[in-house]
Amino acid sequence: MIIKSIKESYPSVFLSIDTYHATVASKTVAAGVDMVNDISAGDMDANMLSTVATLNVPFIAMHMQGTPDTMQDKPTYNNIAKEVVDYFIQKTAACKAAGITDIIIDPGFGFGKTINHNFQLLKQMEVFQLFQVPVLAGLSRKSTVWKTLHITPE
């Protein structure tokens, strides 16, 4: 398996698996992955939170409105920062209740958000400090960047 090869060749490398399937998380952590990054924060697999707790690895919980198939179908928010904070209030509580001790939150730039939503969130990143956990902000190769600069993603 590629994960074992990477860990053998580069033992100090910290690997993350991007998945919303608990079985994938379990198998890849067993192979040497160090962290689970779930775009649904456990919403797409009822076993994810308990699995990550059992695995005892850091968990990146991302906010996404909708699913990967529907997230860009007219995303709507009344107050995006408040709604994402409210989501993480519930989600971090669920993670802690499941036994996850190392939580990282990701506001989910580009996942169920318009360019305007992304900029509103970016301007209010300090609101996430109330959780006292690391915040991951994935901005690379997002349409927010290339559309604002009037260039192509290439």
Where are the predicted features?
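Active-site-adjacent loop and "lid" segments of alpha/beta metabolic enzymes
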Residues: 1-15, 19-23, 29, 34-94, ...
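Flexible, glycine/charged-enriched surface loops at secondary-structure junctions
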Residues: 97-102
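Conserved Motif II region of HX4D acyltransferases
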Residues: 108
